[in-house]
Amino acid sequence: MTDLFAFGSAASSNAAEADYGLGGDMKKTQYVLQLLGFPGQADTLKCLIMAVEMGMETDSGVLDIIDGQDESSEYLEISPFGLVPALKEAEYYVAGESGIMSYIEARGLGKRLAPKNAALLAEQNYWSDIACSEVGPHVNLLVQERILAQMDDSVYMVKSDEINAARKALAAPLDALNDQLAKNTFIIGNYSFADIHWTAYLHLLNEAGEGDLITERANVKAWFDRVSTHKSFSGQNIVAYDLLPKLADIKNKQLNSIVIDDF
C-alpha cells in the first residue's frame, strides 16, 4: 500500500530514537510535522498558518482531492471519514482542521494562542464559528467554480447564478466582520484562532478573483493587510501569509513547507 506520508525530511528518518530524541535529547527534527492537504482547501491553509504561528517546522505534501485521492483506501486508512487535511508526527496521526489546529497550538513553541479570559475565548470561538458556518461554504463554492472545476475540466462553464448567490450570501458576515474590526486591530483584539479561520477563507476568496468583497470594506481590508504581514505569534521571523498558495500554486497543486531558522 502506498505511504501517503513518504515525503519530506521526517519521512527520510530511519531511526526514531535518533530523530525524535527518545533518549532525552531535544532535537530540531523533533518539531518537524508532516501535513498532507490541498492548496485550494481552506482547512489545509488554516493548519499551515497555525504551524507558522506556533513556530513548528512542517513538511507539506499534496493530497489530490480533484483526482479523488481523499477517497482512496490509502487515505481512508489515515482518515476513516475522509477528513482533510491530515497530520503526522512520528507515529501520531490526526485528521481534520479542528484536531490538527488544536494539536499544533498545544504542541507549539512559546505561549498558547487561545485567550485565557473566558469572555475572550467565547468571542474567539464565536467568530471562528461564523467563519466556518457563514463564510466557508460560500468561499468553497466560489473556489470550486472559479478554480477547481476548471482544473478538472478545461471547458467547464462557470455557474454564474451560483457565483452571484454566494457573493450575496457573503455580504452579511463580511459586514459584521467590518463592524467588529472598527474597534479592534485583530478580530477579538489580540491575534487568535478567529484570525486564522478568516485569513484562510479571505485569502482563497481573493485568489478566486473575488477580492472586491474585501477591498470594498475598509476595516476588513485594513485587517487583511495586517494579517498579510503578521509575523509568527511565537516570535520567529516568518510570515504565514507569505507561504499560502497563490492561484498558480493551486493550479499546479503545490504547497509550501515551513522552515524555521530561529527557534
Q: Residue spans of the language-model regions?
A:
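Terminal-tail/helix-coil boundary detector
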Residues: 236-263
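Short polybasic/polar patches that bind polyanions
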Residues: 52, 206, 229
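GST-like domain detector, emphasizing the conserved glutathione-binding G-site
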Residues: 2-164, 254, 262
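GST-like fold's C-terminal all-alpha helical module
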Residues: 2-5, 133-226
